[in-house]
Amino acid sequence: GETEKTLVDSRKKILDYTDEVRVIKCDPHQNPMVRSRFLKTMMREYIEGDFLYVDGDTLWVNPINKEDFSADVMGVPDGHVEFEKFIYHDYHLSLAKKLDFKTPSKFFINGGVLFLRDTPVVHEFMKSWNEHWNISCEKGCYTDQQSLNHVNYLNNNIIKLMPHSYNVQIVFTIRYLLNAKLIHYFGTGLYENEDELCFELQKKSFWSHVKENANIMSLFEDIVTKPYKCFSTSSIKLNYKSEIELKNPIYGFINTLAKSSKVHAKVLLKIFNMGARLSVALFSLLSKK
């Protein structure tokens, strides 16, 4: 595979810490993101026995309990909430409409951690996932969660819920962090400004250091044994209401101006600040009448 070709020099050391490596041939013309989704939706065909799949942007915190896996297919809701209350509800709804897919009535399952049994039912489910992911790709959507949740709908919600502690999505909540089995820190779509990130493994500078440092285990020793130390000292988790407010386009525009080093952006920001002060004063005056 294409990934195997990159495992040279210092990067090859990671193979010393694996029990088994399987090389799957993929289309070399596809980008890494598409290849990873292809493998993800096909993985049931390449692995024997029941297994727990986890995304690469995750960090183990505590041992698993096999008794927690009681159904053929299991996952955790995206955002740890019902779909109706999910901050990206409207986004997923519009994307599903574009793809002509169905959306769940209760939970939109996050594809980052999935338990999959080795049964005929699960093999059929995974085959259908791959087929619908290909349909999604043909329509320009290469991510896998839309097809996953559509196939879950077609199979009468076959995906049952595992304990939330197996997929603690720290960008959404810290509710399950204390008893976390696995932290899902979301390494994709990183911010340009690393000061906005609350977790060390979300930062591009961290992974650049990993690539340059051949002694991988010494670099990760502290992280594996003390994962909570990866949080920034100034980490703040907003409540749902605040997150919705921050999705407002006005805030987004002002935030863009504040980050820009351009002269015109600084001028516009000053004008906005002056306008905001005048608006607050006028609002207070009118409210007293």
Language-model features: locations:
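Glycosyltransferase catalytic domains, chiefly GT-A lineage
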Residues: 1-289
